[in-house]
Amino acid sequence: MNLIVKLRRSFRTLIVLLATFCLVSIVISAYFLYSGYKQEMTLIETTAEAECTDIKILPYRSMELKTVKPIDTSKTDPTVLLFVESQYSQLGQDIIAILESSRFQYHMVIAPGKGDIPPLTDNGKGKYTLVIYENILKYVSMDSWNRELLEKYCVEYSVSIIGFHKANENSLPSTQLKGFPLNLFNNLALKDCFVNPQSPLLHITKAPKVEKGPLPGEDWTIFQYNHSTYQPVLLTELQTEKSLSSLSSKTLFATVIQDLGLHDGIQRVLFGNNLNFWLHKLIFIDAISFLSGKRLTLSLDRYILVDIDDIFVGKEGTRMNVKDVKALLETQNLLRTQVANFTFNLGFSGKFYHTGTEEEDEGDDLLLRSVDEFWWFPHMWSHMQPHLFHNESSLVEQMILNKEFALEHGIPINMGYAVAPHHSGVYPVHIQLYAAWKKVWGIQVTSTEEYPHLKPARYRKGFIHNSIMVLPRQTCGLFTHTIFYKEYPGGPQELDKSIRGGELFLTILLNPISIFMTHLSNYGNDRLGLYTFVNLVNFVQSWTNLKLQTLPPVQLAHQYFELFPEQKDPLWQNPCDDKRHKDIWSREKTCDHLPKFLVIGPQKTGTTALYLFLLMHPSIISNLPSPKTFEEVQFFNGNNYHKGIDWYMDFFPTPSNTTSDFLFEKSANYFHSEEAPRRAASLVPKAKIITILIDPSDRAYSWYQHQRSHEDPAALRFNFYEVISTGHWAPSDLKTLQRRCLVPGWYAVHIERWLTYFATSQLLIIDGQQLRSDPATVMDEVQKFLGVTPRYNYSEALTFDPQKGFWCQLLEGGKTKCLGKSKGRKYPPMDPESRTFLSNYYRDHNVELSKLLHRLGQPLPSWLRQELQKVR
């Protein structure tokens, strides 16, 4: 009994203790909740003077660093899928400019209001590593089927999304983003922004103090959220409380947010405006890097070289005096504390030494006494444009004078770098300049702003010609007439804008190597050259993690082509298509020496016969014969291309009538060349293209017999079947012969490559069998295709020679002019085993060719119809 009483008392005691514990817990919880609320309210009501370096003042609890799921880069190709509003929308163009400047691959499509999105996978691999929406509303308003399809792809292939929201006059003051725990407040005027230093996406961007001042425009969107997946990247304030009554002007708001993927497994970065604000560009580049798993990323290393052209050149009052030279030296030392190995690179024209005022001549002397402090490179002696010199010897004389001046004054002559006045002769290439440079100076490197064109600057590239490395050169807004700060074109604010996040800043941001062109006059008077680069370097170091350094020109060139080896080969263009190019191209040259059409092959299909038939027309003129390749120039497909367009155009006569005369060339190797279509489209983009197709099996056999007749060792050692059926173990000469027999017969593959660069209306496909049996009809079709006049009557001009077995030109007196003895040879018929092998080998290629011809609206040749019947 006592035991039961004791148990009851213990139970009551336990109940009392539990109740007491619960009450204490409630009190403690209430205290901390109230304290947390007060702390949060304190964090939200932040003053405008807050600095981002003090993390305690940041207004979002989500600014605490969270673990982000790593991006799996193995499942996708490194390509961006870009949805734009239209082909010409400004934001879309700005996005493309950054992608192209960064050399990131992208595929642009118009964002569908309704309908399907493009295919996202290919053979089980994702085609895109990142999706960008110019208008994020197009993404959130997609129909459920396509949105689910896209988001499933993003989750499965570890793909992220970047989106922009640009408010307009129709935007509601506030709204919730459909499908997201995210509120948008639109059309706001903002000021004083800073970068969240704890944002995980920061790579290039540094988070310094607040960027004071109003943000451009009054159409900003800010984001508010109540989910741990969101983290602010860029924060700012309202300019005034009147912007929106429900928001406090003392609160910090996010204009760029990062979605860590905790909500639905997809990481995103959203921008509350376009890319007009320079910080948005910087963060956009970092967002691409982070969300692509660093596959689409820019290195932090930046090489800059500042050239000062026209040393000793310039009229009185625009040159450097002693104080200017001392300032140049002092600034160089200052910049060396921020840019490793920084050295100004001085380009001189010795003829103009001591042609200024007395003070300016003293400046010349101080420059020469300080010669070892700088790097030096030769301009032309008299600052003449090299393309005006029509022979190499005259250029050599000018260069020798400048070299003698350099030797007399102790200027180093072994830097291996030169710049031509106005970049004349560098591109378009003036071969005499390259030859003279090598002969007198041993030049290894030059630079130009003209390749392939001056604008847009992001397309500038390098190339190598005649063993001289040509680097892209950048402008910086300083020209010979840019002398005074207050008189800067558009006002001094334009120069400052370029430095502080504008064009000049972006040049360094987006180019791993930048050679800047400045002039002597930029370092006198207001010394805008010094002002520009001191402020530019300070700004870059304040806002980025970029590592700035300088290399001598030759080392810089080697570094450039290590980064961009694909640029070594030039891509020649028609100088007459760019006014700037034509202005710095010799007047002795003419673009009339370029062909209007090309006969591209393939070999052993009847191209020589077509060539001779074309020459019968009074208005059609071919190239002059080559001593090595006879009637074929073979320019676009091989090493001849590196000899330049002057070499190529020398093969063509001057037409008597540039309108009615048609220059052409026939090179049968062009057809299957990987380089020829792109090169031809660059130099002669309006040219028409003619190709001839016969049964690829017959073509392969004919090539084999052709090689036997030319005593090719492999063709003599192996029979035809052994050649076409050999495996990977075969000796190199046999594999080479096999490729030359088989690969040109991949007709659809090669034609598609040409159609990548030329319109279908520029391509004529001739049935080789019809050309052999009925050439007059084919030539009528060719004339119509070319638009050549007058129409030539081939029916009366051609006659069949039964002895030769093909058609010949009928001359006066009944004589004929036929193909040479090497053409139309009689070979033993192909063995059945080889015929069967080739029929199987080309089956898929022939099917693809039939599809291509159907798409082009062209009839199928008889041989192709016969081969397709075998497929069934």
Curated annotation (Swiss-Prot):
Key words, A-Z: Disulfide bond, Glycoprotein, Golgi apparatus, Hydrolase, Membrane, Multifunctional enzyme, Signal-anchor, Transferase, Transmembrane, Transmembrane helix
GO MF assignments: deacetylase activity; heparan sulfate N-sulfotransferase activity; N-acetylglucosamine deacetylase activity
Lipid bilayer topology: Single-pass type II membrane protein
Subcellular location(s) of the protein: Golgi apparatus membrane
Active site: K604
Lumenal-facing ranges: 35-872
Region of interest called Heparan sulfate N-sulfotransferase 4, as start-end residue ranges on this chain: 589-872
Disulphide-bonded residues: C808-C818
Glycosylation, residue list: N226, N341, N391, N657, N793
Pathway annotation: Glycan metabolism; heparan sulfate biosynthesis; Glycan metabolism; heparin biosynthesis
Assembly behavior: Monomer.
Protein name: Bifunctional heparan sulfate N-deacetylase/N-sulfotransferase 4
Lineage: Eukaryota, Metazoa, Chordata, Craniata, Vertebrata
